[in-house]
Design a protein with these regions (language model features):
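ATP/NTP phosphate-donor binding region
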Residues: 1-108
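C-terminal charged capping/lid subdomain of soluble metabolic enzymes
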Residues: 2-19, 310-447
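Solvent-exposed alpha-helices and their adjacent loops that cap or buttress functional pockets
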Residues: 24-26, 49, 101-104, 125, ...
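Short beta-strand/turn micro-motifs composed of small residues
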Residues: 57-58, 113, 170
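Generic secondary-structure signature for well-ordered alpha-helical cores
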Residues: 75, 156, 167, 173-180, ...
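A short, small-residue-rich loop immediately preceding and capping a beta-strand
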Residues: 104-124, 128-138
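A glycine/threonine-rich phosphate-anchoring loop and its flanking beta-alpha core
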Residues: 128-225
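Active-site segments that bind and position negatively charged phosphate/pyrophosphate groups
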Residues: 218-378, 382-386
Length: 447
């Protein structure tokens, strides 16, 4: 089969790709344009997806960002506009506001914005049965074209699977004028693909999880394009902004192709999710997602060098597991996360995640495949200096305090990263091998 890894983003939509991995890769996306002046194409794109009466979901900031012409064109449709302050959050309350305002005569939910508005639109589409689309206003995150929404449900950061949008439009003239923090956020989210791709392959080796080399190559190609454009992003160079935005959109397409966020999300995203949960539980406002992910990626890339130097043994795995106590683990989660711990504990019990037989089987497989696992980790560690230099040049955060996080928060999130959900992370591997505690000490030294 001819690979799709090097196709232009617009060439990835409207097709089905039978693959050697056994899946036929496809996306619901039918209309995609990332270009200068793309807003002029919105009426034609709506027609392409058979949308005659979209319901527009935006906020006061994004309504202003798209400019007078687009604003006037969209005002003829039913809409709901969140205030600029307090900013909308991806939670039940803000979703309920959109549901209450929704016009059931509409045939498309059209978000005008970036992360939170896109997630709320997907959820509104999920509950209403309508397809969704998005007019992107910032190159800030990788969820535009994905088949999931990142929500805070009952205080727990959760990925809810939704149909992918049918329309994605990004006008480079709008995108390049996004706030600087959002430009940095998009870069952080894209550079995180290095660790996400590594951990996807590691999980496949350690657990037999499904993995697709072609989807991974597609994501790698988007990452490489972003790396080559990073210098121009904060200069608001149109070509650089377009390349990074296309990379973020391709990330979502890759998630849809694989029916999982694996190609784009690993331990670094889980750390970000936990930091968000801690901030919200204390009544705070989390830092932009991509800035958190960028900081977590910095730490993980540096830690990879130490992980690659490990020489794990069956005895070490057995010894560490023998010291594990389920009751103590549950009590610790409840102490840290309060009521938010209950769904985390319930999920682990359903999966038998901490039970002796699954742990022993995972450890045995990981040990048998350790040479291959180490090669994957070494390959990503070899790119650490280059990627961290790009982060530094772009002014991405270097320390937790820059994101209103304490070192204690950063340590806590790393310790509990394997507990948030069922995804097999690098920290899951370290726990199975009995190496999590020593790596926690190395991680703490990076902060």
């Amino acid at each position: 089969m001819e690979t799709f890894a090097n196709l232009e983003p617009e060439e990835l939509v409207g097709w089905a790709f039978p693959c050697e991995c056994g899946k036929t890769h496809r996306t619901a996306l039918r209309a995609l344009q990332i270009a200068p002046g793309a807003l002029a194409s919105l009426p034609a794109m709506l027609k392409t997806v058979n949308a005659n009466r979209p319901f527009v979901l935006w906020d006061e900031n994004t309504r202003e960002a798209v400019g007078e012409s687009a604003r006037n064109a969209l005002r003829i449709y039913p809409s709901f506009c969140y205030p600029a302050e307090p900013r909308p959050l991806p939670n039940e309350r803000c979703l309920g506001q959109a549901v209450a305002a929704f016009d059931p005569a509409c045939d498309l939910i059209l978000a005008v914005g970036s992360g939170v508005l896109n997630d709320l639109a997907k959820m509104l589409g999920r509950v209403s049965g309508r397809p969704t689309g998005v007019v992107a206003t910032a190159p800030s995150m990788d969820g535009y074209a994905s088949n999931s929404a990142a929500m805070e449900l009952s205080g727990v950061k959760t990925s809810v699977y939704t149909p992918a949008p049918v329309l994605v439009l990004g006008d480079v003239e709008v995108l390049k004028n996004a706030p600087e923090a959002m430009l940095r956020s998009g870069l952080g989210d894209m550079l995180a693909k290095e660790t996400a791709l590594c951990e996807w392959r590691v999980a496949a080796l350690a657990t037999g999880e499904a993995y697709c080399e072609n989807v991974a190559a597609l994501m790698r190609s988007a990452l490489d394009r972003t790396v080559s454009s990073a210098d121009g992003l904060l200069k608001r160079d149109g070509r650089a902004v377009q390349n990074v935005t296309e990379g973020l959109v391709v990330s979502g397409i890759a998630m849809g192709y694989s029916d999982t966020s694996r190609p784009a999300s690993g331990t670094e995203h889980t750390l970000s999710h936990l930091w968000e949960m801690l901030a919200l539980a204390r009544g705070g406002r989390p830092a932009p997602h991509g800035l958190q992910v960028g900081l977590a990626t910095r730490y993980m890339l540096r830690l990879y060098r130490d992980v690659a130097a490990l020489a794990p043994t069956p005895a070490r795995s057995r010894e560490a597991y023998a010291a594990f106590r389920q009751e103590q683990w549950e009590a610790e989660l409840r102490q840290v996360f309060g009521a938010q711990a209950e769904p985390m504990i319930a999920a682990a019990l359903r999966e038998g995640r901490n039970q002796p037989e699954p742990q022993s089987a995972r450890a045995a497989r990981a040990l048998a495949n350790w040479p291959a696992i180490r090669r994957e980790i070494e390959a990503s560690a070899a790119r650490a200096d280059q990627l961290i230099a790009l982060m530094d040049a772009a002014g991405l955060p270097r320390h937790p305090g820059e994101l209103n996080l304490s070192e204690a928060d950063a340590k806590l999130a790393f310790h509990h990263s394997r507990d948030l959900r069922s995804r097999y992370l690098l920290t899951s591997l370290l726990w199975d091998l009995g190496e999590l505690e020593p790596m926690e000490e190395r991680y703490a030294n990076l902060l």
